[in-house]
Amino acid sequence: MSYDQLPERLRKTCLALLLAMISPLHADLAANPSFLDERFVTLDDWQPMTFPNIKRHSTYSIHPCGDKTCLLMESDNSASGLLWEKTFNVYEYSFLKWRWKVSNVYRQGDSATKEGDDYPARLYVLFNYDPEKASAPKRIKYELAKLLHGQFPPDSSISYIWDNRETTKPFIVNAYASEARMIPVSSGSAQVDTWQEYSVNMLQDYKMAFGQDPPPLASLAIMCDSDNTQESAKAMVDYIRIGSVP
């Protein structure tokens, strides 16, 4: 028997039960449109993110910004980042907004090469790996990575970057990893040392860069690096927000 063939009273009862099941989710999202509102008063919720064989690390500190504080990121022939370890559902909280500025871009920076893969500022969205949904070759690859590093690497990532060179490309495949796609939100030196604000839809950007839907769970990381170019830069981050509305 189809839904349309049910008695009217029973159809109304089914509809009421369905609405009762989904309304708490909608009410929760409406009451909590913002999952993260990071104003960088402290770095208590952020953990260092370092890389094997890179001994010189970038530095991250809370810095005065007028009547408030910001995150100061400094890199001098170095690389490391900050990881926000909490996870969120990107289908429930699809919108990412932030404000930053950089002191300069890198003369030797080139997103097409490993030697030029440095950026004065980048904001990562790291999507969790799910072994139950992975192909057999991918499971083997990720199990080996877990043996080496103690945990699974991200399934994939998108990173919003300040590209060193002027570009109109909607996204760039990272020179080190095809699972990492970079989206230039600013490029070149025309706007250095000025605050730039961005608002993006992570779901749409992932689909644009990968041609498919993303895994549901993700976390954030932020970085200023210069180990490949051996140059230096500073960047400041005013805030980062994740929410269910733009």
Each predicted region: which residue ranges?
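Bacterial N-terminal signal peptides that target proteins for export
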Residues: 3-14
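Extracellular carbohydrate-recognition regions
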Residues: 28-53, 136-137, 141-142
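Extracellular glycan-recognition surfaces and repeat-rich motifs
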Residues: 44-68
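Short carbohydrate-recognition loop motifs
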Residues: 61-81
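Extracellular/lumenal carbohydrate-interaction signature centered on repeated Trp-anchored short motifs
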Residues: 85-96, 189-192
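Extracellular/luminal beta-rich ligand-recognition
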Residues: 118, 128-176
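Extracellular beta-strand ligand-recognition surfaces/modules
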Residues: 121-123, 178-188, 192-230
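Extracellular beta-strand elements of beta-rich domains used
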Residues: 220, 240-242
